[in-house]
Regions:
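Flexible loop linkers connecting adjacent transmembrane helices
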Residues: 29-34, 57-82, 107, 137-140, ...
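Extracellular/periplasmic helix-exit of transmembrane alpha-helices
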Residues: 53-65, 208-218, 236-265
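Loop-to-transmembrane helix boundary motifs in multi-pass membrane proteins
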Residues: 80-83, 118-121, 233, 280, ...
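Hydrophobic alpha-helical segments and their helix-loop junctions in multi-pass secondary transporters
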Residues: 128, 150-176, 185-206, 364-372, ...
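C-terminal membrane-solvent junction of multi-pass transporters and transport-like membrane proteins
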Residues: 145, 317-322, 346-403, 407-410, ...
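Structural beta-alpha unit
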Residues: 455-470, 545-577, 614
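Gly/Ser-rich helix-loop-strand patches that form or flank binding pockets
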Residues: 456-459, 569-614
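Small/aliphatic-rich secondary-structure junction motif
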Residues: 468-523, 527, 543-545, 549-552
C-alpha cells in the first residue's frame, strides 16, 4: 500500500474532532477578543492550538496503544465516586458545547431568514433527528460532510477578509507576543476553553480505535505517526479559521472603536463597513455550517462518555434529545428574558465553563500516557511529560485566577443574595478542589489508600465466567441464539443446548456489536470491547464443542440489535429462536430498548423467551 493510501486510511478522526474547535462558541470569544483588544490575543489562539495538538496527540496515542478511550481508563483507575464526578463534569462540558451550537444555529437562522431567536432555538431540536438519520450513510460520508462544512466556513471568511483589506502585519506580529492582564483574562480563558475542548479528548481516544491498527509495536507506531500528521493538519486548519475571525473583528471593529456585544451586531455591521450585502450572508452561512458540524461530534462524544464511564448504552436518538433539551432550556429562557445581548453573554459563559472542565480531563490523560505499565514502550518521553505538565499547570493557574475573579464579581453583584450565593458556592468549589487534588495526586497516594479506593468496575465488558459449563438439561435442526454478553446468555444457551442434544441440532450464536464505534465503522471496528467479545464467544464455542454440540458463531455490527437479529433470522430460517429476557420495564424500556418485544413481532419462526433457571 502506498504512503498516501495509508495516510488516507488513518485520516478522519482528527477532522471530526477539529470541528469542535470552530463551533459558535469560538466565534463569540474570537469576535469579542478582536473587537475589544485588536490583535492582542492572537498569541492565545496560537498557544491554544499548540496545546490542542499536544493533548489530542496524547489522546490518540492512549486509544491506539491501550485500546481504551479516556473514559474507560478513568473508570478502571479511579474509585466509583470519583469516576461518577468526572462523568458529571464531562456531561456539563458537552451540554455547554451544545448550548453554544444551539445559540449559534438560532442566530444564523435569524441572520439568514429573519426567524425570531426564540423560534430558532426551538427549531434546533429538529436537527437532532435529521443528523442522526445522516449517520446511517456511513463514517466516510460523515467525514466528507464535515469537511465540506469546514471548507464552507474557511471560504466564507477568506472572502470576508479579502473585502476588509490586508491587515497590518506588524500589528499581527505583535499580537503573537504573549501579554495578559485582568482586563482580557476572561476572554483569553474563554478562547482557551473554546479551542481546547475537554470532551474532544474523550472523543479522539475512541475514534482512533475504529481503524484496524494491528497488534505489533511497529503497527501501533505507524498509527501514532499518521494520527499525529492527521491532528496537526486538522487543528492548524482550525487555527486559521479562528485567527481569521479574530483578525476580521480587529480590522473592521477594533480600529473603528466599535464594541461588539452580540454576533448579530457583528453581522449587521459588516454590510455597511465592507460595502456589500453579501458580507452578512457569508457570515450567516459560515455560522450555520459551524453549528451543524459541531452537532454531529457532540452526539458521538456524549455516547462515548456515557458508555465509557457508566457502561450504559443509551439509544442514540434519546441521548441526542437529552443533550439538546438540556441546552435548549437555558437558551430559550435567556433569549426570552434578555434577548440578543443575553445570548451573546451566554455564549461566552459556555466557553468559560468548558475551560474550567479542562483540568479534569487533561490531568488524567497525562497520568495514563505517562504510565509505563499501560503504555509500554509508547510511554511519554521526559520532554513530552514536561510539556504536558506545563500545559496542565497553565490551564489550572488560569482557571483558578478566573474562578477568583468570577466569584468576586458574582458576590459584588449579588446584593441581598450574597449570603445564599456564598452558601452555595463554598461546597461546590470545595468539592471541585478536592476532586482536582485527587486526580492530580492519585498515582502517588499511599498504597493502602489506593487499594481501598480501587475502581469497583473492571475495564471493558463485564463478562460472566463459565457460561456454558455444567449446563442443566431442560428440549430442532437449526437453533438461533442471540447473545448480549451478560449472565442471561447462560439461561438461553442452557435451553438451546438441551434441545440440540435431543434433536441433533446445530446452534447459531449471534451477537450484535452496538457500541458507538461499531455503529459508525461496522466490521472495521477493533476496540477492546470487540476483542473481548470475540474471546468470550470463542470460549463458549469451545465449551459447547466439548459436549459434542455443533455450533457456529456469527458477529454483526449494527445500530439496532433488533433489526439485525430479524435480518439474520430471515437469512438463516431457523427452526427455533431462543432469547434470554432482561426484565426491563417502564422507563428502562425507553432508554435501553425492548429487543425481545420488537423481535417477536417481526419473526415468523418459534421464539422461546427464557426468564431464568432455578
Amino acid at each position: 500500500m502506498s504512503l498516501w493510501r495509508r495516510m488516507f486510511a488513518f485520516a478522519g478522526p482528527a477532522y471530526l474532532v477539529s470541528v469542535g474547535y470552530m463551533d459558535p462558541g469560538n466565534w463569540a470569544t474570537d469576535l469579542e477578543g478582536g473587537a475589544r483588544f485588536g490583535y492582542q490575543l492572537l498569541w492565545v489562539l496560537v498557544l491554544s492550538n499548540l496545546m490542542a495538538i499536544l493533548l489530542q496527540t496524547l489522546s490518540a496515542r492512549l486509544g491506539i496503544v491501550s485500546q481504551r478511550d479516556l473514559a474507560q481508563a478513568c473508570r478502571e483507575t479511579y474509585p466509583r465516586p470519583v469516576s461518577y464526578a468526572l462523568w458529571v463534569l464531562c456531561e456539563i462540558a458537552i451540554a455547554a458545547c451544545d448550548l453554544a451550537e444551539v445559540l449559534g444555529a438560532a442566530i444564523a437562522l435569524n441572520l439568514l431568514f429573519h426567524i425570531p431567536l426564540l423560534t430558532g432555538v426551538l427549531l434546533t431540536a429538529a436537527d437532532t433527528l435529521l443528523l442522526l438519520w445522516f449517520t446511517r450513510l456511513g463514517i466516510r460520508v460523515i467525514e466528507a460532510f464535515v469537511l465540506s462544512l469546514i471548507a464552507i466556513i474557511a471560504v466564507c471568511f477568506a472572502i470576508e477578509i479579502f473585502w476588509a483589506g490586508s491587515p497590518i502585519l506588524s500589528d499581527v506580529a505583535r499580537g503573537v507576543i504573549p501579554h495578559l492582564s485582568s482586563h482580557n483574562l476572561y476572554i483569553a480563558i474563554g478562547i482557551l476553553g473554546a479551542t481546547v475542548m475537554p470532551h474532544n479528548l474523550y472523543l479522539h481516544s475512541a475514534l482512533v480505535q475504529t481503524r484496524r491498527i494491528g497488534k505489533s509495536a511497529k503497527e501501533k507506531l505507524t498509527a501514532c505517526r499518521f494520527n499525529l500528521i492527521d491532528s496537526t493538519i486538522a487543528l492548524n486548519g482550525a487555527l486559521l479559521v479562528n485567527a481569521a475571525i479574530l483578525v476580521l473583528a480587529a480590522m473592521v471593529f477594533f480600529k473603528r472603536g466599535i464594541v461588539v456585544t452580540e454576533i448579530q451586531q457583528a453581522s449587521h455591521l459588516l454590510t455597511p463597513l465592507l460595502g456589500t450585502t453579501f458580507a452578512s450572508i457569508f457570515f450567516g452561512v459560515a455560522l450555520l455550517s459551524s453549528g451543524q458540524s459541531s452537532t454531529l461530534t457532540g452526539t458521538m462524544a456524549g455516547q462515548i462518555v456515557m458508555e465509557g464511564f457508566l457502561n450504559i448504552r443509551m439509544r442514540p436518538w434519546l441521548r441526542r434529545l437529552m443533550t439538546r433539551t438540556i441546552a435548549i432550556i437555558p437558551a430559550a429562557l435567556v433569549v426570552y428574558a434578555a434577548g440578543e445581548t443575553g445570548t451573546y453573554k451566554l455564549l461566552l459563559l459556555s466557553q468559560v465553563i468548558l475551560s474550567m472542565q479542562l483540568p479534569f480531563a487533561v490531568i488524567p490523560l497525562i497520568h495514563f500516557t505517562n504510565n509505563k505499565q499501560r503504555m509500554g514502550k509508547f510511554v511519554n518521553r521526559a520532554w513530552v511529560q514536561a510539556l504536558a505538565w506545563s500545559t496542565a499547570a497553565l490551564i489550572v493557574v488560569l482557571n483558578v485566577w478566573l474562578a477568583i475573579l468570577s466569584v468576586r464579581d458574582w458576590l459584588n453583584d449579588a446584593g441581598g443574595w450574597r449570603g445564599r450565593l456564598e452558601l452555595g458556592l463554598v461546597p461546590i468549589l470545595t468539592g471541585l478542589a478536592l476532586l482536582l487534588l485527587w486526580v492530580t495526586f492519585h498515582p502517588v497516594l499511599p498504597l493502602w489508600l489506593r487499594k481501598v479506593a480501587r475502581a469497583s468496575v473492571e475495564l471493558g465488558v463485564d463478562l460472566p465466567a463459565a457460561v456454558a459449563e455444567n449446563l442443566p438439561s431442560p428440549i430442532y435442526r437449526k437453533i438461533l441464539v442471540p447473545l448480549d454478553h451478560t449472565s442471561r446468555d447462560r439461561d438461553a444457551i442452557a435451553h438451546a443446548a438441551a434441545m440440540a442434544k435431543q434433536h441433533g441440532a446445530k446452534l447459531y450464536l449471534l451477537h450484535v456489536e452496538e457500541g458507538v464505534t461499531s455503529q459508525l465503522f461496522g466490521p472495521l471496528s477493533s476496540t477492546a470491547e470487540v476483542e473481548a467479545g470475540d474471546q468470550y464467544l470463542h470460549q463458549i464455542i469451545r465449551d459447547l464443542e466439548t459436549q459434542q454440540i455443533a455450533v457456529e458463531m456469527v458477529v454483526r455490527h449494527a445500530r439496532t440489535p433488533t433489526k439485525e437479529i430479524v435480518r439474520y433470522a430471515e437469512e438463516l430460517n431457523p427452526d427455533l429462536v431462543v432469547m434470554g429476557a432482561h426484565g426491563h420495564k417502564g422507563l428502562k424500556d425507553i432508554v435501553f430498548g425492548t429487543t425481545i418485544n420488537a423481535v417477536r413481532h417481526k419473526l415468523k419462526v418459534p421464539l422461546l423467551i427464557v426468564r431464568g433457571i432455578k
